[in-house]
Regions:
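FAD-dinucleotide binding site
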Residues: 17, 46, 54-57, 115-119
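Short hydrophobic core segments
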Residues: 10, 17-29
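Glycine-rich loop(s) and the adjacent beta-strand/alpha-helix scaffold that form part
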Residues: 29-78
Length: 182
């Protein structure tokens, strides 16, 4: 158990550990940072940084309007960090595989969520987060509080993995009606 930092390292309940340097891993731009750092450009030269200037907009945390065929695993709007991550990754990969098989079977080349489906998804995340204790935290990386200038919105889907899986399965069963498919 950590007790304190010393001149040469860290003191725990049972030991003293000496280090040349201690690097505190704080300030990561969770969930959105890795995608924003790619400088992605979608349809009509839409830059992701501009599209997400007020909040990340995804549908199911799997795709972004105006960015056809861009699939995301563990993206903003997915349960991601609020679930068992390997199980969630597996679910995402299976959903994406099924979606690609659907496109191939139907001779379609592109898919992207509608702006309306992404807005409804963001509204659902906000509704669930507002009804939880998550929003009571004064400072939380879940809301982007650790990054100056980052929009302050709840980022992961807080409805639980079983509910999320059911929603994804329903979207698949309804043949991706919430998407623009060409």
């Amino acid at each position: 158990m950590y007790k304190r930092q010393t001149k040469n390292g860290i003191k725990t309940k049972n030991n003293d550990f000496n280090f040349d340097k201690i690097i505190f891993a704080t300030g990561y731009d969770a969930l959105t940072g890795p995608l924003l750092s790619l400088n992605l450009v979608g349809k009509k030269k839409t830059k992701l940084q501009n599209f997400w200037n007020k909040s990340p907009k995804t549908y199911l945390g799997l795709m972004i309007p105006n960015f056809p065929n861009l699939f995301i695993i563990q993206g903003p709007g997915s349960p991601s960090v609020l679930t068992n991550v390997p199980v969630q990754i597996e679910q995402h990969v299976e959903w994406i595989t099924n979606c690609l098989n659907f496109l191939n079977k139907n001779n379609k080349k592109t898919i992207e969520p509608t702006i309306n489906s992404a807005k409804k998804w963001s509204d659902e995340i906000k509704r669930l987060a507002d009804a939880s204790l998550f929003m009571k935290a004064k400072i939380s990386w879940y809301k982007g509080d650790n990054i100056p200038g980052k929009p302050k919105v709840f980022i992961p889907y807080p409805g639980g993995l079983p509910r999320y899986r059911n929603i994804c399965n329903k979207v698949e069963k309804n043949q991706y009606k919430e998407f623009l498919i060409k």
